[in-house]
Design a protein with these regions (language model features):
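Conserved post-catalytic alpha-helical subdomain immediately downstream of the catalytic base
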Residues: 43, 228-299, 303
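Conserved N-terminal subdomain of the carbohydrate kinase-like
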Residues: 11-23, 38-119, 133-138, 294-307
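A short acidic, amphipathic alpha-helical/loop segment
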Residues: 55-56, 127-134, 155-159
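Short beta-strand scaffold segments in enzyme catalytic cores
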Residues: 34, 80-83, 213-217
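Short, conserved phosphate/pyrophosphate- and ester-handling motifs at nucleotide-, phospho-/glycolipid
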Residues: 36, 170, 240
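Histidine-anchored nucleotide/phosphate-binding helix
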Residues: 27-37, 132
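Conserved phosphate/ATP/ADP-binding segment of small-molecule kinases
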Residues: 137-140, 147-224
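Extreme N-terminal starter segment of soluble prokaryotic enzymes
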Residues: 1-4
Length: 307
């Protein structure tokens, strides 16, 4: 199966209490694509600078990621630097240099427009809208956003919500978008702003809660899933996009897209995020084997067996 993904590619400088690195390959496209590539062929659309080396393109191709949709522009690749303390929920952004990403205005290649699964990474909601309008009735559209866009591009974001099937955000962003402190009420409000899917099913909101797992809401039901507990966590960068990669990747292989398959997909998303945080940047996702994913899924599944 094929997945179209649109978002950022970056060079990250990361510092945690346990690991650090400079110019680490990152961005939403990198984490999403590496995670999803274990399930499907990935067709990313993004922009990089002249400092993006042939070895980086080679890495993508090695992992079932088609690099033909990546534009190489004059200038430097988007770069970001962040620091974490022992509470990984508190992150300090040292700098953000958009560079070539500042002028990113994606035009989908003709062959990409009919790809049935679309992931919209964290970016300007107007760009997300433009991308949706270029596609030819995809089977599933999943989007991410953040507090910056909720605050500055609210109208555009609300229009985007009416075109997507699933929104993935964290609890603070849920409250901010809904303008409601109670998380349950906030989730219900956001789902009510979304239109029924092209399949006639309920729109879905997934709320990421880090070490506390996630909540999934449809118009009728809700579902809670814990995180996969790890002894060692070294770097949470990209975990949300790795979750999305596992989630969409699993769904791309399913005959039926419904609440049951969505729930199982959240388990695979959680598994991919758990691998991501075990090493600096995307290192673990790069070396990960399908066998390891299935072994961890079986362990995770046992948590829900009645004793």
């Amino acid at each position: 199966m094929k997945i179209l993904a649109v978002g950022s590619i970056a060079f990250d400088t990361i510092k945690t209490p346990f690991v650090s690195g400079k110019n680490v390959l990152g961005g939403s496209l990198t984490y999403f694509s590496l995670a999803a590539s274990h399930f499907a062929k990935i067709y990313p659309v993004g922009v990089v600078g002249r400092d993006f080396k042939p070895k980086h393109f080679k890495l993508y191709r090695k992992h079932n990621i088609n690099s033909q949709g990546l534009t190489r522009a004059a200038g430097k690749t988007f770069s970001w630097s962040g620091q974490y303390d022992y509470d990984f929920n508190n992150r300090k952004t040292v700098y953000t240099h958009l560079n070539v990403f500042a002028n990113f205005d994606p035009v989908l290649p003709t062959a990409y427009k009919s790809i049935p699964y679309l992931f919209l990474g964290n970016m300007d909601p107007q760009l997300q809208l433009n991308i949706c309008r270029q596609t030819a009735n995809p089977r599933l559209i999943v989007a991410d956003t953040m507090n910056y866009w909720i605050e500055r591009k609210r109208k555009e974001l609300l229009r985007t919500l009416k075109l997507i099937d699933i929104l993935i955000i964290n609890d603070a962003e849920t409250r901010q978008l809904a303008k409601e402190h109670n998380l349950y009420k906030a989730a219900r409000k956001i789902v009510s702003l979304m239109k029924p899917t092209r399949r006639g099913g309920s729109p879905t909101l997934i709320i990421k809660r880090g070490e506390y797992g996630l909540l999934m809401f449809t118009r009728k039901n809700w579902f809670s899933l814990p995180a996969f507990i790890l002894e060692d966590v070294f770097d949470p960068t990209g975990a949300g996009d790795a979750f999305a990669g596992g989630f969409v990747g699993f769904l791309s292989r399913q005959k039926h897209l419904n609440e049951k398959s969505f729930r199982k997909a959240t388990m695979y998303g959680t598994i991919m995020a758990s691998f991501c945080v075990e090493q600096l940047g995307p290192k673990k996702l790069i070396t990960l084997k399908r066998r390891q994913i299935q072994e961890r899924f079986k362990k995770f599944k046992k948590l829900f067996a009645l004793i």
